[in-house]
Amino acid sequence: MKEFIIRDGKKLRLGYTTGSCAAAAAKAAAWMLLSGRKKESIRLLTPKGMELALAVEDIYLSPDCVRCAIRKDSGDDPDITRDTLIYAEVRKTETVGIVIDGGQGVGRVTKPGLDQPVGAAAINSVPRRMIQEAVEEVCGLLGYTGGLYVVISAPDGETLAKKTFNPRLGIEGGISILGTTGIVEPMSEQALVDTIHVELRQRRAGGADYVLLAPGNYGVDYIKGAMGIDPATAVMTSNFIGDALEICRELGFRGALLIGHIGKLVKLAGGMWNTHSRYGDCRMDILTACAAAEGLQGGAAAEMLCCATCDDALRLLKEQGLYDAVLHRLAGRIDDMMHYKCSDIETGAILFSKEYGYLCETKGASKLLRRIKED
């Protein structure tokens, strides 16, 4: 694709989804099967309203079956499916209608709560509709009223899936065919939030009332090493802590416990619900404010404001004899902000640092932890 967007002052090239690849491949294969003629390019109108003109690759053409592929172009997005070939194989059937299924390298759903039912190929609803409409368009143009069987495959999918959330979500054997707009926008925050939503929805469908959240690998490692909990029980939120809490509320969880490094979670005390540094860095401001409320003054406060890391600030608090008091105040502030954010579910947080280990927790954290272990 040649289309671009501007993000954070950078010009970034758009791409197209695996769903667009599957629909375009199915459209091309259906056209070749029903017309008997080879087609080396295909046009596809995406749900976003953008039309794609895509090269058709690796064509196999016979009277009974046509198979071809579209190469995934992720644009400037760091997508693991970049350059992967997504295949569609189309055959005529004696029954009326279009049947869509997954083949090699397309995962199968094994747990409830996902976009597709258990046992179905992991081809999500929008890509299924895109495939259906693309094939129906060809049938209409060529006057075909019979049935067609469409199989979507991705030969590299089983290997690629090991680098995705699919194994944790209960999708086995391959990748998912995804996309709601048909277009990939580089570094899309919404795509990351959607991933969190999928995993939380799957946990809720599995019967969980309480959920453990971790912003990143530090939190997961701490959960495993210091708390003796299977890290697979935690849902990774990345920087989208506020979104994750709102999703928990929306899905009907009774409670959510957040476990993370102080460098991330201190920002919650300032009402910063997306903790990415592009939205600001208030770590030392918040810690210094908490310390000042506990009596830190003058030069020591100025020194804390200049600390490069939270561990440096904690070291200074120890020297000033304010370590416990400030952490207690910080936990209280985080508790207040989490309650303000999601007052209709139980929330809690446990903070740690790599140098000092366990630091503090909000007042409901221990109870939530027990419930998560029992859930």
Features from the language model and the residues they span:
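Flexible, glycine-rich phosphate/dinucleotide-binding loops
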Residues: 159, 220, 358
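A structural signal for small-residue-enriched, beta-sheet-centric alpha/beta enzyme cores
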Residues: 3-6, 13, 169-175, 180-329, ...
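N-terminal charge/polar-biased segments
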Residues: 1-18, 32, 36-39, 140-141, ...
